[in-house]
Amino acid sequence: MILALLLLCSTITQFSDGYVIGGGTQPGGNQNNPNSPTYNGGIGGGVYPGGGGNNGGVQRDEGGYCNSNTDCRSGLYCTASVNGVKICLSTSNGGGGNGFPSGNGGCQTSSNCQYGSVCVVTNGQGNCQIQTGGYVSPARQGMVRYPSSNSITVDFNEDVFSKNAPEPGKINSGCERDADCDDELSCTMYFGEMMCRSPIKPLIPLRCESDAECPSTEYLCVFSTAMQDRVCYKYGDVVTDGYVIPIKHKISMELKKSTTTSSPPITTTHLSKPEESNGLFAESEAIFEQPGSLLTSALQKRADKMSQNGPTPPMYVKMSDIPSEHVIAGQHDGEAVRITKVVVKEEKEMEENGETREKVIPKIGEGVGMVDDEPIDPMATVCQFDYHCRMGESCSGRVRFVDRNVTVCRYDMFKKHRQCLYHSDCISGQRCTPTGRDIATCETDISATIGSIQCFYDYECSGGEKCTLVDEKERKFVCRPSPTSDPRMNQICTTNSQCPFQQVCRQSGGVSLCVDVSIARNPALLHERLWRFLRNFILRTL
């Protein structure tokens, strides 16, 4: 029995050089006791947080654990960071730095230490030590003074900003907002501190009025709910601020060249039908070609050209609606566009034959008639599907040119069965609900109406609402109106001069609100706007 125990102890002693019993694998794959000749670096090598070794391990990329500069790839430096952990960083990310390494004495201020370390003075002796509370930027490196080893009093030196602190607004300088940084930098949380840093990609999208103003044809001019403006987004970008460009949407940007010479009017336009989808309405494919050039800017260009040729009567653009709801209910928007083309062709043939036709005002929604000859914004978005438009709009406006007819987005708050991809495409009180035809439409939902929809991202909310924390204890998030009031939606007024551009002051239910000119003469839409205003006001106070 004694002989067996001695044999077991000798075996443990022999192998304990290679691994610490019970040690296990450390972050990065490193095994304990790295100084052992039988050390096994493990997958990826790795080290202990705040120390360890890389004997036998591969050199680390940026962000990998390290113990010294030799553990990092060329151009990277082993730098102290959060909670005593050392990681490989480039100089652009705060790596390296001149001065005493951690553990060395002789410092007077933290500017004498490497990045990530502070000068701690104990009994009159300064030592560079890792800031275990988090990364310390050069702009915030001061000196921590301990009067005596037995004292618990901590005194911070007045010289908080070291001599080598970066200039305000420059990289690694402290900040509170983007405005504190240079134009090419943004105020970013970096190792627990707000600093001016170079963004990985532009954080503020380029504002635009049409696709033509975007950097290339890979970008789409899309309305952003968060920015309340149109911005350029690249195909495949996932934007969680109220509008998402689906990754699987393929959009053909082979635009036909528009001709300025006289040519026979185009009466029909072929539109590609959507391909067979995979059953998920949020990832359905929509392949289409835009007729003519970038028509979102063509309206303004044509008006400019006419004004240059000499004084002419003002150009008015007439809007007509697509066929009534009972004709196109449940129909794909692309089919509605094709029907519009056929109607235009029939009208042209009747005019050539000298026939007349009684004018009928089509209806939208539940019997709400639209204003005849309603003007269209010259920068109206050209569309072929409802979800190409902003929330509260539909792809139902029609612009008639001599050689072609174009469908554009128009204010259409009451459209039923509006096509959608995400809940954020729908107005307040609606949810994007899939149908049996592999298409999703905006439908009324009681949970959305009373504000009880739980969420994780903003695009899970409808009506431009934000995913808001309402219960700190239970960490409950629900969709609520944005705390930032939108002046185009919630502006109380007494005169038109108090309203934003293209809005007027109108009274409904005893409350005067700024509303779009396009709905100013429609009582039903005015009541809808009032209801949304009161609902948002109540939910904000909850």
Swiss-Prot record:
InterPro entries: Diff-Dev_Assoc_Protein. Residues 258-269 have a biased composition (Low complexity). Residues 256-275 are annotated as: Disordered. This is Uncharacterized protein C45G9.6. It comes from Caenorhabditis elegans.
